[in-house]
């Protein structure tokens, strides 16, 4: 991926599970729904457009286009309709059932203050996703980090 060093967000985490298990957690919605979104139209497959739904946010839906999948190495998606909004997962096998996952989001645009807010929000969001993944895969605990970031009680008028 060609990253513009001024307009991307990144989060990374060590997950103490084999790379195949960590990779599967991101392509298989039966697992991903335990730590991120609540529904998906199907499993990630290269060339397909998939709907991800966050029911806790009023059924907020994002359509992602899967640009490439390299088993146990990388996933690249286009996030929504913006062709520049690209998210990439990189999986590194550290041996001894340890996987280092890096998520990079490129395509942040706008004025400087808008870009700073997007970088902050995307970095926070993917950090919560990785922390939720870690808790789920390593300890079989669903922390509900994504849902609890914006509790409905704080958003109701």
Model regions and ranges:
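Glycine-rich portal/gate segments that line the openings of hydrophobic small-molecule binding cavities
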Residues: 39-81
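Generic structural detector for well-ordered beta-strands
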Residues: 12-16, 53, 65, 90
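Short, surface-exposed coil-to-beta transition loops
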Residues: 8-10, 59-64, 84-88
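Beta-strand/loop substructures that line and gate deep hydrophobic ligand-binding cavities in soluble
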Residues: 81-128, 146
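Hydrophobic ligand-binding cavity/cleft-lining segments
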Residues: 1-41, 156-157
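Hydrophobic pocket/interface hotspot
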Residues: 22-26, 32, 50, 66, ...
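Short, highly charged C-terminal tails/helix-capping segments
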Residues: 135-157
